């Protein structure tokens, strides 16, 4: 399988970012483990996959996979890299975008300085 990807770094975490908008990517636990392996694959802390939105009020859906292939709910450093990837690759011309994750919605903003601002939903402390 051949895929286009970017290797990105955010405050010490490294990511393989995959555009699932313009190419088909069949994700499996074994594929994630291979990509993340530092000797046999590309090597990364997490694999990030950008997908089409699942709701009309969202710009993109964002999936986060740990090195062991498990899918997780959130990664703030990864969200910053996703915003930069979306902007740099022309996937959106917007400065502010909304993305959904496994269980959350984030607002991302590309600042004039090139930095990325990530706005999380307020935490819920009740069980």
Question: Where are the language model's segments positioned?
Answer:
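A glycine-rich beta-to-alpha transition motif near the start of alpha/beta enzyme domains, typified by
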Residues: 1-112
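Catalytic phosphate-donor-binding core of small-molecule kinases
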Residues: 103-127
């Amino acid at each position: 399988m051949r895929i286009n990807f970017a290797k990105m770094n955010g405050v010490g975490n490294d990511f393989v970012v995959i555009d699932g908008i313009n190419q088909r990517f069949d994700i499996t636990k074994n594929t994630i483990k291979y990509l993340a392996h530092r000797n046999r694959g590309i090597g990364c802390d997490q694999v990030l996959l950008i997908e089409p939105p699942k709701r009309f009020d969202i710009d993109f859906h964002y999936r986060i996979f740990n090195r062991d292939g498990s899918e997780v709910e959130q990664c703030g450093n990864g969200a910053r890299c996703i915003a930069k990837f979306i902007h740099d690759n022309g996937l959106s011309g917007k400065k502010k975008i909304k993305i959904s994750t496994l269980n959350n919605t984030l607002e991302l903003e590309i600042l004039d300085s090139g930095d990325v601002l990530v706005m999380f939903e307020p935490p819920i402390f009740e069980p």
